[in-house]
Amino acid sequence: MLDSIRTTIPAKDGVRAGDLLNRDFTAPRPDHTWVTDFTYVRTWAGWVYVAFILDVFAQRIVAWHAATTKTTDLVMVPLRMAVWQRRHEGHPTAAGELIHHSDAGSQYTSVRFTEHLELEGISPSIGSVGDAYDNALMETINGLYKTECIRTTVFHPGPFRTIADVEYATAAWVEWYNNRRLHSSLGMVSPTEYEHAHYSAIDRERQPV
């Protein structure tokens, strides 16, 4: 049964940070706040778990990762990918200026994960256990992913047999979501376009008169 799958299981020996957002899912710039969570997809071979990291400013998915187990690597891999992606784009994250917000799942409170956040200079923020509103933006993204990608044949022509099928569909959906899906909250532009406009405005301000 789908209802029997729990993604938020608190760790007995984890490191529990406070909630720095208090349900305020807005940001003044890119890489001010990342929200993250993972969801699950049923395949013929078993459950697949898909983790996303979303930049709150433009609601852009900066990284994602799929796995067949709910270990710390499920959330560690996209974190490393997100940091690398920003550096590759010429906008590296700055120590002490980025908040990473998640639920209280054992993956996010593990010593290994919290130590890596500290290494990157990222401030951890964790909502309360069992309260979806404390990570409402990611709950919305997970819902869109299920509705637009998993429960349709738009991004995959048939049932999901293995993790490879999930990865194929997810990659296509993320590309569409970031670059072509129009958001009313962003003025009917895509997350990538909204973010690009922000950096273009900064570049214009820096140009000599």
What are these regions (language model features)?
Residues 1-209:
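Charged DNA-binding/catalytic regions of mobile-element recombinases
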